[in-house]
A protein has these predicted regions:
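Pepsin/retropepsin-fold aspartyl endopeptidases
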Residues: 1-161
Length: 161
């Protein structure tokens, strides 16, 4: 079982504008449990593209939030467009801030940097995540395969897949 153990870090500004390092516990509180990921087209769709003689879009890397509040994994819509992901369906997204909103559904695969595993996520919802500095929200549909330990006091997370 692969294990990833990280301690978050970051920087903040003092009232006079000086940049200072943040204690790990504060960095984890402010940013949440984030990991670096590589995202690409789901394997079955990628194989079909190759069989047709089409080039595969290059994977993209960025940050993902391990989000126990999200029922589904979500990808930033702009990232989905840059990866030229096909829209395979339209679903309804609900959140604490808005009622049902139409959302494109994309087939992706992703890996958490540091893990030797490609995770297939065939029904990933599109969302506006760029403003939060995120590429993905890893929701409960994928976290069901994981053990996550969140140690707020030390600013550390441990993820087992």
């Amino acid at each position: 079982m692969p294990i990833l153990h990280i301690q978050l870090g970051g920087q903040g500004k003092t009232p006079d504008g000086k940049i200072v390092p943040l204690p790990p516990a504060i960095a984890l509180q402010q940013r949440g449990p984030v990991v670096q990921v590589s995202v690409s087209l789901q394997e079955s769709y990628a194989k079909a593209l190759v069989q047709q003689g089409n080039p595969l879009p290059q994977p993209m890397t960025g940050f993902a939030l391990l989000d126990t509040g999200a029922s589904n994994t979500c990808i930033d819509d702009e990232v989905a467009q840059q990866l030229q992901l096909p829209v395979i369906d339209v679903g309804s997204m609900c959140s604490a801030s808005h009622a049902k909103t139409p959302s494109n559904i994309y087939p992706i695969q992703f890996s958490v940097i540091g893990f030797p595993i490609q995770l297939q996520c065939p029904r990933t919802m599109g969302a506006a995540l760029k403003e939060q500095g995120l590429m993905l929200l890893i929701g409960r549909d994928m976290l069901v395969y994981c053990t996550l330990f969140y140690n707020g006091g030390t600013g550390q997370i441990t993820l087992c897949i």
